[in-house]
């Protein structure tokens, strides 16, 4: 998933694919940026699937630092929904049984 924020107060991501399915442990994690979507931005601005949204987010996050959460089976990551975040690439072993699967839960106040 590319860089985006979500229309929620709290996000919970849970990775459910076993570690033995991972080809490259330097990938498959989650990047959580230190910047959050500004309150005046619309959902389309911070979660749009178009070039205008992409360029706006790219410019806003230009010098932003992020934390990288490494992939780990059965790991839950809890963070603020308006924090920009993205999948840290994906490189799993070949085969349907090795696909990276996660559940994402979005919670309001």
Predicted regions and their residues:
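Catalytic core of non-heme Fe(II) oxygenases with the double-stranded beta-helix
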Residues: 1-109
């Amino acid at each position: 998933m590319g860089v985006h924020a979500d229309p929620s107060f709290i996000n919970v991501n849970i990775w459910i694919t076993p570690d033995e399915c991972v080809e490259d442990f330097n990938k498959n994690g989650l990047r959580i940026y230190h910047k959050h979507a500004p309150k005046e931005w619309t959902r389309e601005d911070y979660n749009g699937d178009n070039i205008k949204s992409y360029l706006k987010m790219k410019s806003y996050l230009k010098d932003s630092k992020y934390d990288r959460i490494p992939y780990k089976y059965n790991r839950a990551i809890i963070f603020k929904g308006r924090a920009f975040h993205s999948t840290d690439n994906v490189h799993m072993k070949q085969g349907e049984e090795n696909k990276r699967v996660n559940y994402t839960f979005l919670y309001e106040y």
